[in-house]
Amino acid sequence: MLPQTALLLLMSLNLVHGVFYTERYQTPTGIKGPPSNTKTQFFIPYAIKGKGVSLRGEQGIPGPPGPAGPRGHPGPSGPPGKPGTGSPGPQGQPGLPGPPGPSATGKPGLPGLPGKQGERGLNGPKGDIGPAGLPGPRGPPGPPGIPGPAGISVPGKPGPQGPTGEPGPRGFPGEKGTSGVPGLNGQKGEMGHCTPCRPGERGLPGPQGPTGPPGPPGVGKRGENGLPGQPGLKGDQGVPGERGAAGPSGPQGPPGEQGPEGIGKPGAPGIPGQPGIPGMKGQPGAPGTAGLPGAPGFGKPGLPGLKGQRGPVGLPGSPGAKGEQGPAGHPGEAGLPGPSGNMGPQGPKGIPGNPGLPGPKGEMGPVGPAGNPGAKGERGSSGLDGKPGYPGEPGLNGPKGNPGLPGPKGDPGIAGSPGLPGPVGPAGAKGVPGHNGEAGPRGVPGIPGTRGPIGPPGIPGFPGSKGDVGTPGPPGPAGIAVKGLNGPTGPPGPPGPRGNAGEPGLPGPPGPPGPPGQVALPEDFVKAGQRPFVSANQGVTGMPVSAFTVILSKAYPAIGTPIPFDKILYNKQQHYDPRTGIFTCKIPGIYYFSYHIHVKGTHAWVGLYKNGTPVMYTYDEYIKGYLDQASGSAVIDLTENDQVWLQLPNAGSNGLYSPEYVHSSFSGFLVAPM
């Protein structure tokens, strides 16, 4: 019923106006997206024309809007409209909650984002003390710290006495002492009475008999030639000898070949002759021909002319060829400060500068709790062998050893007739020394036999029991000096009296460099009555000193080895070796090292090494036609026998340049001992 009523209303409007207003219902515009699927939209796809005569009259006044008709049935859905471009509408109110759906076990969802950090809760009650934790693993070494400020030098308390040093090398043997005066013979005792008498104990050895007269000279065979001796030292140049007398002239030699034709020299001018008699005046001669033009004359310089007017400015000349780079000039005097220029634009961010000087020392913080003992660190690698030390001073002479125990005296043997010398037999066991027999008559000297081969050494005998101390005997003949085994070092004896000065020996080889001398101080530097001792290894404040500055005298050193800076400006402590280019630490502490190099020809890459490990690198990219500079510095802690040097690690970047007047240098000094 409702659709029919709407259709009749539309037909009546068409009859009045003659034209049917075609209305198309479109989807709402302004919202992007797919066409709406609502079922309330419809459209009429064709126009309905009225029947009869259409009279077009004037348009009347639009009437008031009629009452809204009842809601019609939803028409069929029209075709989708063009997508709109409107702005999204306001968000609708949330709909009523739908009925609960059937429950089903869903898949676990993705983990949600972490929530916001909650507020800090109240502190809980203090828990019981837990068990002590195990020491954690040893952490990696931290970066080297910034050097602290120079401390105030205060003389410290004397440290405890160090351990006793190792015993020094055995000293030279002392001079042989003089033999003691033999004692007086005691009084002869009374004759003893005994029945049957036991043989008495062995008496003391008697004094050595007087030396017999020398025998006739023996006839021995000529010995073998000895080994050639060592070449003697070169003697001093002798005094030039006197000039010898002239020798007699030799016989006349054969005539020589004819020499080339000589060119005679003009002789000396002759003595002028006496003036002749003046002659008669002759007839005037015919005029001669014109002579040759004379030599150009040299007139005296005339007076300087007036100053001429300034000429026009000449054209600029063509640029000359590029000259060779001259040597670096001496730094000129500082010029007058120029006027301040206008504020320029902000430049690009510069390279970060070197770390600044350390700030003032902060106040001492509270002492923290004692930490747990850390795990024992791994043993470090053994350092490089140090240079051999200088020879120590000779030790004091040890005390003279006790005299050896005299062996038991052997029984006297029966003197036999002298036999022919036989071959040398094997050495027998050592016999008991016999009593000194009475001097027999001198026998006929025998013929000296040939020298036999050296026999094998005998079996050493058992040590005898200690006998009584014998009376000092007369000095024996001088023995053969053989160096014995070094005995244990005895305690130092008291210094002996000064001996007589010996004869001057041969000049020895040059010794190692001696310790540096003392530093002289000006008179006004020292207070009255005070003379502080300052050595090369100790500064004015009493702290130890270790410093050096060296220069490289040759450009382009070798690759992969320490750079030998061989020209020394300061190296009194001898801690830097100019032959190897290595600085060896003798005083453990904190050191400061710096280097300044010039670069020419190619790039330069320099490394500062400590015990074979690079500490830092410096690189300079060379620009052709320029002389570049590069520098670097570092603070390093060193222990004894640590070594530091500079090295070129790459063969492609070896442009280290150091000629005669453009120096590359390397310096280092001790900041604070540890």
From Swiss-Prot:
Residues 54-521 are annotated as: Disordered. Coiled coil: none annotated. Hydroxylation on proline residues within the sequence motif, GXPG, is most likely to be 4-hydroxy as this fits the requirement for 4-hydroxylation in vertebrates. Its main location: secreted. Residues 106-116, 277-293, 303-312, 393-403, 441-453 have a biased composition (Low complexity). Residues 57-519 are annotated as: Triple-helical region. Residues 19-56 are annotated as: Nonhelical region (NC2). PROSITE patterns: C1Q (PS50871). SMART domains: C1Q. One of its GO terms (cellular component) is collagen trimer. Residues 541-674 form the C1q domain. Disulfide bonds join C194-C197. It is found in: Secreted, Extracellular space, Extracellular matrix. It comes from the Eukaryota. The modification 4-hydroxyproline is found at P460, P463. Residues 137-147, 207-217, 506-516 have a biased composition (Pro residues). Ca(2+) 2 binds at D628. GO terms for molecular function: metal ion binding. Ca(2+) 1 binds at D620, E621, L627, D628. Residues 1-18 form the signal peptide. Keywords: Calcium, Collagen, Disulfide bond, Extracellular matrix, Hydroxylation, Metal-binding, Repeat, Secreted, Signal. Type X collagen is a product of hypertrophic chondrocytes and has been localized to presumptive mineralization zones of hyaline cartilage. Homotrimer. This is Collagen alpha-1(X) chain. The gene is COL10A1.
